[in-house]
């Protein structure tokens, strides 16, 4: 895959990473989410918004494209095609990471998808398109969408559409679901897992299980930051999945780190460890995060306003005789991430509801993640970020 990615697709991946870092900074600066563990899937949100852009016209399309950071809507679809077909292809049969990614378009029977939109959804995004009855069977359709997501995510995301979120005003739902399960190349010995102190943002501490290892690790220390790179077992292709742990030296440095990542687009690439180093001590807490948000306000903070208002233009999505157009009313997103001695299991889903308008390291180092840190799961050949989040207390699961 490394030699087949076109230049415009690589540029789109860079834009997707920039979008991920901006969103992470927005989440970290939100008082509610900053006080708890958080996780989200940039590739899930980016894909859902890219598919939304396929049905948008005029200024709405331009604003979606600008928010997602690419110059043309065609770049979004080219990236989606590469992500669906290659980056997130399942490699479990050859000993690599298990990956599943599915897109779905659920449209009310009173509307017809435009052939041009349906072609992009099916051919580029490999989306299932289904005609449903929101008018009289909203509860049944909610169960249908939730069951579809639950199946793709192996039961990790159960209710992407909250009870009562879909009613007879709903006209269309764009949804996707992502599942990832990867085993560490070098698994941690569970006998070495011991309780130790993790220091919280308020200065207090909790005891939590820490994994340990005597192995050399990919580690870089620079600019008041330590970056750990943990590889997952590779399958029969050239994809390389890694988890990155970004640990600020200052115990309270989480928010400033998120701001720096957002402000400097190449910050992550400049701080990727390239070599293994010997460690005196290595401690990484086990953690499990379930995180859900209604992301409309976060996206508005990034400059995406038009799709949510009465000026929204989604004339390229459906054929309709109704005088009103469509607008986005809700963007539901959920993510699950669990890290333990064997590896990582992660899942995510995004659902968009639409209604009618109204430096070189020293030879020996320590890595002790005993205070809040950022993490991300990335496929390194392409650079696509699958999951991202922060841990402020490993004992909190939701």
Curated annotation (Swiss-Prot):
Its annotated function is as follows: Inhibits chymotrypsin and cathepsin G in vitro.
Q: Which family does it belong to?
A: Belongs to the serpin family.
A Pfam family found in this protein is Serpin
Q: Where is this region: RCL?
A: 343-367
* Domain description: The reactive center loop (RCL) extends out from the body of the protein and directs binding to the target protease. The protease cleaves the serpin at the reactive site within the RCL, establishing a covalent linkage between the carboxyl group of the serpin reactive site and the serine hydroxyl of the protease. The resulting inactive serpin-protease complex is highly stable.
Site note Reactive bond applies to 357-358
Q: Name one GO molecular function term.
A: serine-type endopeptidase inhibitor activity
Q: What is this protein called?
A: Serpin-Z1A
UniProt keyword annotations, A-Z: Protease inhibitor, Serine protease inhibitor
GO-annotated cellular components: extracellular space
